[in-house]
C-alpha cells in the first residue's frame, strides 16, 4: 500500500503535460492556467494543514515559485518545438543531473566511496538516456536547428527547476510549509513572464486542471516520504516519464519511427535506472 502511495506522484505528474496539450493553448496560457490550479489547491491545503509561516518561509517559498514558473514556461515552449515525448525525457534527465551535481557540491551528499560510484554511474546512465531519447531519424527528422533551440530552451527550464528545488532545501523548509508561498510565487512568476502574450483566455482556465494534478502529486509525495523514505519515493516519482513519453505517442498521436521508439524506450529505462541509483545514494 505504501509503494502504491509513492507511485501516485508519478501518475499525477506524468499526466501534467498530456493534460496541458489536450486542454489546448500555447505555452503562456498553459503556464498561467497551471498556476491558477496550483494556487487553488495550495490554498485548500493550507486551510486544512495550517503550517506555521515565518517571514523566511514566505520569502524563500515565493522565490522558489518564481523560478518554477521560469522552468515550466520554458518546458512548455520546448514541447511546442520537440513534442511531449522528447521534451519530458530530456527535461527529466537534465533535472536529475543538475540537482545531483549541485547536491554534491553544495550539500556534500556523496561522502562515501559507494555513493560516489553509484552517483557517477547514475549520471552516466541518465546522460546516455537523454542522448537516446533525442536521437533523430532520417524518416522523421526535426527541422534544421529545431533540436538545438529546444535544448537551449530546456537548459533555461532546468535552471529554473534547479533553483526552485535547491533554495527550499538550502533554507531547510519542509514541503507542507512551502506549498502556499510557492504557489503564490508560481502564479506571480507566470503572470510576469507571460503578460506580453495575453495568457488569460479560455485555455488558461482549462489548464487549471493540470495545476490541480501538480498539487495532487505534491501532496502524495509529502504523504509518502515519511512512509517509504527518500531513497524509495524519489526514484518512484521519476517513473512518470513513462506515462508522459508513451502517453504522448499513444494519446497525442506524436509520430515516431520504429527506431526512435526503441531508443526512447531504452532512454526512458536508463533515466529511471539512473534515478533508482540516485535514490540509493540518498538512503
Swiss-Prot record:
Domain of life: Bacteria
Transmembrane segments: 4-21, 26-48, 52-71, 84-106, 110-132, 151-173, 178-195, 208-230, 234-253, 260-279
Cysteine-cysteine disulfides: none
Subcellular location: Cell membrane
Gene Ontology MF terms in the entry: carbohydrate transmembrane transporter activity
Membrane topology per record: Multi-pass membrane protein
Keyword Transmembrane: yes
GO cellular component, as recorded: plasma membrane
Protein keywords: Cell membrane, Membrane, Sugar transport, Transmembrane, Transmembrane helix, Transport
InterPro entries linked to this entry: Sugar_transport
Family: Belongs to the GRP transporter (TC 2.A.7.5) family.
Protein name: Putative sugar uptake protein BC_0219
Organism: Bacillus cereus (strain ATCC 14579 / DSM 31 / CCUG 7414 / JCM 2152 / NBRC 15305 / NCIMB 9373 / NCTC 2599 / NRRL B-3711)
Amino acid at each position: 500500500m505504501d509503494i502504491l502511495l509513492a507511485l501516485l506522484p508519478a501518475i499525477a505528474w506524468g499526466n501534467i503535460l498530456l493534460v496541458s496539450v489536450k486542454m489546448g493553448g500555447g505555452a503562456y496560457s498553459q503556464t498561467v492556467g497551471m498556476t491558477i490550479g496550483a494556487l487553488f489547491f495550495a490554498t485548500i491545503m493550507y486551510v486544512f494543514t495550517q503550517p506555521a509561516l515565518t517571514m523566511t518561509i514566505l520569502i524563500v517559498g515565493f522565490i522558489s515559485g518564481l523560478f518554477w514558473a521560469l522552468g515550466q514556461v520554458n518546458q512548455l515552449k520546448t514541447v511546442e518545438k520537440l513534442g511531449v515525448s522528447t521534451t519530458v525525457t530530456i527535461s527529466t534527465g537534465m533535472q536529475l543531473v543538475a540537482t545531483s551535481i549541485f547536491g554534491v557540491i553544495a550539500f556534500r551528499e556523496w561522502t562515501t566511496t559507494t555513493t560516489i560510484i553509484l552517483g557517477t554511474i547514475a549520471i552516466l546512465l541518465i546522460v546516455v538516456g537523454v542522448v537516446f531519447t533525442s536521437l533523430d531519424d532520417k524518416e522523421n527528422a526535426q527541422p534544421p536547428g529545431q533540436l538545438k533551440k529546444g535544448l537551449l530552451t530546456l537548459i533555461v527550464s532546468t535552471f529554473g527547476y534547479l533553483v526552485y528545488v535547491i533554495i527550499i532545501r538550502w533554507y531547510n523548509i519542509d514541503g507542507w510549509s512551502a506549498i502556499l508561498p510557492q504557489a503564490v510565487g508560481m502564479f506571480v512568476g507566470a503572470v510576469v513572464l507571460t503578460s506580453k502574450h495575453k495568457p488569460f483566455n479560455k485555455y488558461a482556465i482549462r489548464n487549471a486542471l493540470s495545476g490541480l494534478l501538480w498539487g495532487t502529486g505534491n501532496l502524495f509525495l509529502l504523504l509518502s516520504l515519511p512512509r517509504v523514505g527518500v531513497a524509495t519515493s524519489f526514484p518512484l516519482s521519476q517513473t512518470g516519464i513513462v506515462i508522459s513519453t508513451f502517453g504522448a505517442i499513444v494519446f497525442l498521436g506524436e509520430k515516431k519511427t520504429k527506431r526512435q521508439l526503441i531508443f526512447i524506450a531504452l532512454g526512458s529505462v536508463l533515466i529511471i535506472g539512473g534515478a533508482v541509483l540516485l535514490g540509493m545514494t540518498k538512503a
